[in-house]
């Protein structure tokens, strides 16, 4: 990578789901003549549109987005792959003379890109199959306690009910005989860019109100129909034990339970809102603990994306004059 690329400031728009990241990133990208690198672990998948609040076709025509609609639902992908691929993509964008704006809320994607990542072992289908059998027989709590005994530091960062990361952590332990914490303490692979994080802050009550309103809007725009298409397409293979991580997502989880007859539609809708609010709370906790971001009070700009983008640009120019 040319040394000059490492000196170009790259604004990173952080924030909880529903906080206004997409609109702010687009406004900032238009001001900077930039392309957007999306750090969202679900928007990268095709077919997951309404449920992931993917930028609209019009928004993507206005500003080029990367890592949107690039993978099939069944393709596995992780934070280390994203960090590596995003670094390559950023270098390619800089080579065209454009600037870059990073935007997203996927905590591990952002951490890997901004702070580097440890080299973790490849997936082992045999070990994963055994662990999923253990999960079915003993339940998530038993597996979480097993991880907690071996790696309490890493276990404390996990939600015990989210089995995807739990299984992966135990898989790493069995494959490498080392814990995730031990591997993370080893050599960190860091992209050599100058990232400048900005966070979008809203009063919690307002954020939760926006999440509830956005969820209602998603259902008006056809979220149930989208989930039904995905359920009809992928449920048969999932019933055979095939794990599709992309569909283990807030919104789709609850609607799949409705389609299986386990919940009423109203119950599913309310759970989507509740689980999205819970996720937003975890995102904010992670961002504040892990990143030294300049937090912008989104309410002070009346939640106006352009005004917020101008404020970010002013701060960016003051600290890093480049445009």
From Swiss-Prot:
Keywords: ATP-binding, Magnesium, Nucleotide-binding, Transferase, tRNA processing. SUPFAM superfamilies: P-loop containing nucleoside triphosphate hydrolases. InterPro entries: Dimethylallyltransferase (IPR039657), IPT (IPR018022), P-loop_NTPase (IPR027417). Signal peptide: none annotated. GO terms for biological process: tRNA modification. It is an enzyme of class 2 (transferase). ATP binds at residues 15-22. It catalyses: adenosine(37) in tRNA + dimethylallyl diphosphate = N(6)-dimethylallyladenosine(37) in tRNA + diphosphate. Substrate binds at residues 17-22. The keyword Chloroplast does not apply. Residues 40-43, 164-168 are annotated as: Interaction with substrate tRNA. One of its GO terms (molecular function) is tRNA dimethylallyltransferase activity. Its cofactor is Mg(2+). The record marks 106, 128 as: Interaction with substrate tRNA. Its EC number is 2.5.1.75. Belongs to the IPP transferase family. Catalyzes the transfer of a dimethylallyl group onto the adenine at position 37 in tRNAs that read codons beginning with uridine, leading to the formation of N6-(dimethylallyl)adenosine (i(6)A). Monomer. This is tRNA dimethylallyltransferase. It comes from Chloroherpeton thalassium (strain ATCC 35110 / GB-78). The gene is miaA.
């Amino acid at each position: 990578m040319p040394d000059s690329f490492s000196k170009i400031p790259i604004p990173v728009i952080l924030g909880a789901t529903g906080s206004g990241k997409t609109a702010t990133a687009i406004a900032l990208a238009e001001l900077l003549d930039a392309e957007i690198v999306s750090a969202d672990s679900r928007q990268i998948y095709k077919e997951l549109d309404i449920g992931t609040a993917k930028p609209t076709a019009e928004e993507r025509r206005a500003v080029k987005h990367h890592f949107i609609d690039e993978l099939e639902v069944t393709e596995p992908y992780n934070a280390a792959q994203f960090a590596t691929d995003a670094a390559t993509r950023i270098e390619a964008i800089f080579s065209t003379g454009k600037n870059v704006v990073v935007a997203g809320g996927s905590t591990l994607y952002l951490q890997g890109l901004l702070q580097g990542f440890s080299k973790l072992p490849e997936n082992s289908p045999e070990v994963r199959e055994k662990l999923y059998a253990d999960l079915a027989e003993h339940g998530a709590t038993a597996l979480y306690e097993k991880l907690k005994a071996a790696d309490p530091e890493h276990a404390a960062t996990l939600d015990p009910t989210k089995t995807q990361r739990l299984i992966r952590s135990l898989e790493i332990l069995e494959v490498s005989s080392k814990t995730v914490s031990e591997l993370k303490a080893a050599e960190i692979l860091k992209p050599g860019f100058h990232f400048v994080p900005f966070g979008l802050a809203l009063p919690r009550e307002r954020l939760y109100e926006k999440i509830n309103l956005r969820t209602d809007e998603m259902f008006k725009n056809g979220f149930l129909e989208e989930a039904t298409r995905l359920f009809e397409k992928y449920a048969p293979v999932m019933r055979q034990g095939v794990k599709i991580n992309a569909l283990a997502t807030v919104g789709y989880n609850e609607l799949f339970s409705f389609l299986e007859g386990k919940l009423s539609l109203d119950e599913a809708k309310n759970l989507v809102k509740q689980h999205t609010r819970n996720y937003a709370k975890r995102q904010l906790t992670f961002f504040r603990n892990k990143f030294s971001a300049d937090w912008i009070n989104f309410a002070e700009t009346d939640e106006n994306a352009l005004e917020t983008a101008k404020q970010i640009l002013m701060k960016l120019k003051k600290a890093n004059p480049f445009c």
